[in-house]
């Protein structure tokens, strides 16, 4: 009897160990579900935000982006070249590729080109930051007025480029470490409808890339996982740059990451790092539930990718008007959001600052 009891206890113990082992040894594509981000110290926060420069972003990126850039236009090509050359010049060593294709539109076959920048293509998992670089097409009948799409989405694209530039050293160190978690940037072409929004006349670039990734094995030798499985979290930035931005919650599956942004906002406010920011929370509202918004995340959402949609609610007052220009941008909120986003990315990637600023005593 005693021997049986001992055997039963041994088997139970082995079962517990096996269960714990199996819980830790989850498939790589499920690691995103239990991913935990780091929290930077106050000195590390100060170091991270000291690298970003709003004036630099404004001159180098935003002014370059503020041109008519509908698909196939000269402005579109100019902006694409700027994105590629900017990322290609950085020390982190981004792999920059194009996803070029033709698609039928209300104006016939038109060329589209997405840009994909990957910090470490060998990494199994990717945090994705995404935006669209095209501007809405208006026929030439508006007395010479041009739609520049400052919030929609020149500012979001500029913010992503500034993040890569400001955190170049940190991202290079992350890449050199061989981490299995990396950063990927998507710049979509053809988000806007060319005539009237339908499922066919919209989201040209994101629909094409989502399908391409769904049919491309990842890792390359895989038989049952695709590049879509590599996406830990898909963070889409849109309609950013107006005054008093608020970001609500569309997806319960990523509430904790919207809450993470709110916590970063609170901490930076408490440390005095946010300008003209009277309340500790102004931007990120995980308790504010908003309805589904059609945007470049939809083709990825439909494939099961987890989405964090950073789009202002309500939309900016200048949305889809000729007043969506540089003159009506709010520099202060853009600068504050730059800081919050850059901290969020480094914390998600579990990347400590290279040279933390010493805390005062």
Feature roles, as predicted:
Residues 145-260:
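Acidic/histidine-rich catalytic neighborhood of metal-dependent amide-processing enzymes
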Residues 116-118, 126-130, 184-187, 232-238, ...:
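Structural recognition of the beta-strand scaffold that forms the well-ordered cores
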Residues 36, 71, 233, 239-361:
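Active-site-adjacent substrate-binding region
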Residues 57-64, 74, 78-91, 155, ...:
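Extracytoplasmic/secreted proteins, especially bacterial periplasmic and envelope-associated proteins
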Residues 25-29, 34, 40-41, 50-122:
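A non-catalytic alpha/beta surface segment that caps or lines the substrate-entry region
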Residues 102-105, 121-123, 133-137, 190-194, ...:
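Solvent-exposed loop/turn segments at secondary-structure junctions
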Residues 44-52, 64-77, 101-106, 142-154, ...:
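Second-shell loop/turn segments in exported
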Residues 5-25:
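Cleavable N-terminal signal peptides of Sec/SRP-targeted secreted and luminal proteins
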């Amino acid at each position: 009897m005693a021997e049986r009891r001992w055997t039963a206890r041994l088997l139970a113990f082995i079962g517990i160990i096996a269960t714990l082992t199996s819980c830790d040894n989850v498939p790589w594509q499920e690691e995103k579900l239990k991913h935990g981000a780091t929290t930077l110290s106050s000195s590390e926060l100060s170091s991270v935000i000291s690298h970003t420069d709003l004036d630099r972003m404004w001159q180098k990126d935003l002014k370059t982006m503020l041109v008519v850039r509908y698909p196939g236009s000269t402005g579109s090509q100019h902006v694409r070249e700027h994105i590629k050359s900017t990322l290609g010049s950085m020390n982190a060593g981004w792999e920059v590729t194009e996803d070029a294709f033709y698609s039928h539109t209300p104006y016939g076959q038109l060329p589209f080109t997405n840009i994909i920048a990957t910090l470490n293509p060998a990494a199994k998992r990717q945090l994705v930051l995404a935006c669209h670089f095209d501007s809405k097409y208006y026929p030439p009948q508006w007395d010479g007025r041009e739609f520049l799409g400052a919030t929609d989405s020149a500012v979001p694209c500029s913010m992503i480029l500034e993040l890569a530039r400001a955190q170049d050293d940190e991202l290079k160190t992350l890449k050199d470490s061989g981490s299995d978690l990396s950063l990927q940037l998507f710049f979509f072409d053809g988000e806007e409808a060319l005539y009237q929004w339908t499922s066919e006349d919209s989201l040209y670039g994101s629909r094409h890339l989502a399908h391409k990734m769904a049919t491309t094995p990842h890792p390359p030798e895989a038989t049952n996982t695709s590049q879509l499985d590599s996406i830990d979290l898909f963070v889409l930035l849109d309609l950013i740059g107006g005054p008093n931005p608020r970001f609500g919650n569309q997806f319960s599956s990523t509430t904790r990451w919207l809450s993470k942004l709110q916590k970063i906002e609170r901490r930076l406010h408490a440390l005095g790092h946010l300008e003209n920011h009277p309340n500790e929370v102004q931007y990120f509202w995980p308790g504010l539930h908003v309805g589904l918004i059609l945007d470049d995340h939809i083709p990825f959402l439909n494939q099961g990718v987890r989405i964090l949609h950073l789009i202002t609610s309500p939309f900016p007052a200048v949305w889809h008007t000729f007043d969506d220009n540089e003159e009506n941008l709010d520099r202060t909120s853009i600068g504050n959001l730059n800081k919050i986003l850059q901290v969020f990315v480094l914390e998600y990637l579990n990347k400590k600052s290279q040279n933390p600023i010493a805390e005062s005593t």
